[in-house]
Amino acid sequence: MSPGQGQKGNPNDPRSEASKKKDLIARGDYTPTPAGKAAFFILRGIEPVLQYSILAHGLGTSVLHRVGLRTLPPGLPTHTGVPLIDGLGLSPYRLVLLGMAVGAAVKQNIWVTALSGEPMPVTGAIAVGVFNAVFNSLSTYAFLSTATSASIKGDFPQPALLIGSSLYVVGIMTELIAEVQRKRFKMNPDNKGKAYTGGLWSFARHINYGGYTLWRAGYAMAGGSYTLGALVGAFFAWDFSQRAIPILNEYCEKRYGAQWEEFKQKTPYQLIPYIY
């Protein structure tokens, strides 16, 4: 079973079957799925090892060379005085990219273990693991290729790295804080059946999606400069605005009724405050 499947007949999800199939989360279903969540945790936990293998040892770069692309030399390793960091043997720029992979894995494992109550089937966990590995590797290989790397656009720290890192930190912290705020609200029995409209959610109705879009764009920008950052950011903005938000809005309209309509009036922005 993959995310979105197995929702048919779920009395807690009043949406149409077409909307349920498009959703990656079984809304209103809190069936325990320890195997799936364990698989999610493990796959996300080991994914940074893949990024390290690419950054430190050039895993897969032979394919780039085979099609005529050149890759960057390793660069001088970082010296911080911290053995755990220095032992990685990565240049400062590569260390930042690895840190982004680690940060994303940690954030998502916090989500699956402490913040999400919905089911996570094993197949869904595998899909999420592969998805993240592909997008993170895209940024890493874009960095390594001299044709696309943000690293060759000036001296360290390059503007694309500074801007991308800022977007990454703001985005991932926004997503995490928003989800923690909502979780704390939902854990209070007095709030059962209520929509959470406070905290960061008062700035945009799907602020967690906005945060995700920002950090994904920032990660891509840090690796593949402005073009890749813009493409990745546009992709997620499109997916959320055309798929995820409409089907979640349908769920919230039918579950919360007048509460949700009032929220929409008070908070007109859906994804990113003052933009969309």
Model feature map: region roles:
Residues 2-67, 149-181, 187-276:
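Hydrophobic transmembrane alpha-helices
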Residues 60, 65-153, 163-167:
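Intramembrane catalytic core of multi-pass membrane enzymes that act on lipidic substrates
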